[in-house]
Amino acid sequence: MRMDTLDSQAAEAAQEEEIQRKLEELVTLAKDQGFITYEEINEILPPSFDTPEQIDQVLIFLAGMDVQVLNQADVERQKERKKEAKELEGLAKRSEGTPDDPVRMYLKEMGTVPLLTREEEVEISKRIEKAQVQIERIILRFRYSTKEAVSIAQYLINGKERFDKIVSEKEVEDKTHFLNLLPKLISLLKEEDAYLEERLLALKDPALSKPDQARLNDELEKCRIRTQAYLRCFHCRHNVTEDFGEVVFKAYDSFLQLEQQINDLKARAERNKFAAAKLAAARRKLHKREVAAGRTLEEFKKDVRMLQRWMDKSQEAKKEMVESNLRLVISIAKKYTNRGLSFLDLIQEGNMGLMKAVEKFEYRRGYKFSTYATWWIRQAVTRAIADQARTIRIPVHMIETINKVLRGAKKLMMETGKEPTPEELGEELGFTPDRVREIYKIAQHPISLQAEVGDGGESSFGDFLEDTAVESPAEATGYSMLKDKMKEVLKTLTDRERFVLIHRFGLLDGRPKTLEEVGSAFNVTRERIRQIEAKALRKMRHPIRSKQLRAFLDLLEEEKIGSGKIKSYKN
């Protein structure tokens, strides 16, 4: 028995020593990598540690040693964050400019914002949803919303507004059925609005008893509840409802101005009868506006304060969601560099897509926000490149065709080892060779005339282009000599013959004249001018005169004067 006891004590001591050694191994590993996972704890601890109580003791021991215990998913998330941080640091180093360069500052500041977990995304989305519900509830209290909704519904019925821009399609399964119900819904809203106005006017009666006032207020509240229920049946998008809110804020400004006017008149009404009359008129005007709004001045103020508070909460939650996903924009935008837009412009466009994704995200579908936002960010970036990257804008569908051809060319080049011909590429993609050539021509980028040519940059591309609108020195010299020689030859003719040739062929101003126009100058018939012209031309063909001009025939043929380009023979 004594030997058994000793053996048992020795085994326990060995087991405790092994446990202590394993715990030290856990602490060493945790300090090396900054944390330890549950999986690593299970691997290192001996098999005898299999009860929850023993595991809890180990976790308490590690907590006392300031060791952080994480799930494998948390570890992967940390690795991902470190990888993104390194990428951001690399991008910041590669961005050109001084330390206060906007790209560098943006990347540095963005790297300090932590990423969101799935649970945090859901929590923020719920805050946004709650704020939107409260915003809609407050806005629909006002009669302005009824008038705006009826107006928009009429536009939908008449086809003057796009259905998907006004109505939330996820809440309306049958578009045709919904449009057929709109006239009935409009009729119900108008009835309730008329009933509401009637009760509001009745409440303004100063002789109204308290029981009647309580009864009218009760009827008024029930009418408002029914009106809000009908308005929700329109299933308007959140942005449309917020447009109704703009009408509320605009009316609120006019309410405040009128209230200020009434307060100013109150101070003068006691000693000025004209001010008293204006005060009464201002109060009547205020009563009319209260009826038009469906709210008293005090109710209006209270509702607007609440509306602004919920709008601020909504914007704060959206801002938090956007700022936590700016790294996603960077990771997508960097794949589209060197395509015609600067990196900063790509980031800006991607951020706009991210904000749109925040507006449209539905957390109940179960996927992560980053999965949903990636499509919107990529869509915004690619659309911006298509619209802004080229000096001459190419339609988006043509951009897609160009990319298809370029991918096909790259694929064939990798397979064959040579640049594919238009015929080979057309056969691969199902295009005609002429269509492929046309696409290649469209895909060419314009070149700036100021683009530097050569290593020194002393010449620009425009220096090597011929300016066809300017005469060459040889051409100008040839025409100058021709004009001088023409003057000498024409001097051998009579004054009348010289005048007729000059004006008939436009040698003076480049504009030939008709026989009638020349004849009117001499007050003779067109036939007589024709005879003078024929005689003058015969003289010009005489060898003595023609040989002086024959040397210029080559110049005239080269410049194609006969095609309509006529030079005057005088400066």
From Swiss-Prot:
<protein>
    <recommendedName>
        <fullName>RNA polymerase sigma factor SigA</fullName>
    </recommendedName>
</protein>
<dbReference type="Pfam" id="PF00140">
    <property type="entry name" value="Sigma70_r1_2"/>
</dbReference>
<dbReference type="Pfam" id="PF04539">
    <property type="entry name" value="Sigma70_r3"/>
</dbReference>
<feature type="region of interest" description="Sigma-70 factor domain-3">
    <location>
        <begin position="400"/>
        <end position="476"/>
    </location>
</feature>
<keyword id="KW-0731">Sigma factor</keyword>
<comment type="function">
    <text>Sigma factors are initiation factors that promote the attachment of RNA polymerase to specific initiation sites and are then released. This sigma factor is the primary sigma factor during exponential growth.</text>
</comment>
<dbReference type="InterPro" id="IPR028630">
    <property type="entry name" value="Sigma70_RpoD"/>
</dbReference>
<dbReference type="InterPro" id="IPR007624">
    <property type="entry name" value="RNA_pol_sigma70_r3"/>
</dbReference>
<comment type="subunit">
    <text>Interacts transiently with the RNA polymerase catalytic core.</text>
</comment>
<dbReference type="InterPro" id="IPR007127">
    <property type="entry name" value="RNA_pol_sigma_70_r1_1"/>
</dbReference>
<dbReference type="GO" id="GO:0003677">
    <property type="term" value="F:DNA binding"/>
</dbReference>
<dbReference type="InterPro" id="IPR013324">
    <property type="entry name" value="RNA_pol_sigma_r3/r4-like"/>
</dbReference>
<dbReference type="InterPro" id="IPR007630">
    <property type="entry name" value="RNA_pol_sigma70_r4"/>
</dbReference>
<dbReference type="Pfam" id="PF04545">
    <property type="entry name" value="Sigma70_r4"/>
</dbReference>
<feature type="region of interest" description="Sigma-70 factor domain-2">
    <location>
        <begin position="321"/>
        <end position="391"/>
    </location>
</feature>
<feature type="region of interest" description="Sigma-70 factor domain-4">
    <location>
        <begin position="489"/>
        <end position="542"/>
    </location>
</feature>
<dbReference type="InterPro" id="IPR000943">
    <property type="entry name" value="RNA_pol_sigma70"/>
</dbReference>
<comment type="similarity">
    <text>Belongs to the sigma-70 factor family. RpoD/SigA subfamily.</text>
</comment>
<dbReference type="InterPro" id="IPR013325">
    <property type="entry name" value="RNA_pol_sigma_r2"/>
</dbReference>
<feature type="short sequence motif" description="Interaction with polymerase core subunit RpoC">
    <location>
        <begin position="345"/>
        <end position="348"/>
    </location>
</feature>
<keyword id="KW-0963">Cytoplasm</keyword>
<dbReference type="GO" id="GO:0016987">
    <property type="term" value="F:sigma factor activity"/>
</dbReference>
<keyword id="KW-0805">Transcription regulation</keyword>
<dbReference type="InterPro" id="IPR014284">
    <property type="entry name" value="RNA_pol_sigma-70_dom"/>
</dbReference>
<dbReference type="InterPro" id="IPR012760">
    <property type="entry name" value="RNA_pol_sigma_RpoD_C"/>
</dbReference>
<dbReference type="InterPro" id="IPR007627">
    <property type="entry name" value="RNA_pol_sigma70_r2"/>
</dbReference>
<feature type="DNA-binding region" description="H-T-H motif">
    <location>
        <begin position="515"/>
        <end position="534"/>
    </location>
</feature>
<dbReference type="InterPro" id="IPR009042">
    <property type="entry name" value="RNA_pol_sigma70_r1_2"/>
</dbReference>
<dbReference type="Pfam" id="PF03979">
    <property type="entry name" value="Sigma70_r1_1"/>
</dbReference>
<dbReference type="InterPro" id="IPR050239">
    <property type="entry name" value="Sigma-70_RNA_pol_init_factors"/>
</dbReference>
<dbReference type="GO" id="GO:0006352">
    <property type="term" value="P:DNA-templated transcription initiation"/>
</dbReference>
<dbReference type="Pfam" id="PF04542">
    <property type="entry name" value="Sigma70_r2"/>
</dbReference>
<dbReference type="GO" id="GO:0005737">
    <property type="term" value="C:cytoplasm"/>
</dbReference>
<dbReference type="InterPro" id="IPR042189">
    <property type="entry name" value="RNA_pol_sigma_70_r1_1_sf"/>
</dbReference>
<keyword id="KW-0238">DNA-binding</keyword>
<keyword id="KW-0804">Transcription</keyword>
<dbReference type="InterPro" id="IPR036388">
    <property type="entry name" value="WH-like_DNA-bd_sf"/>
</dbReference>
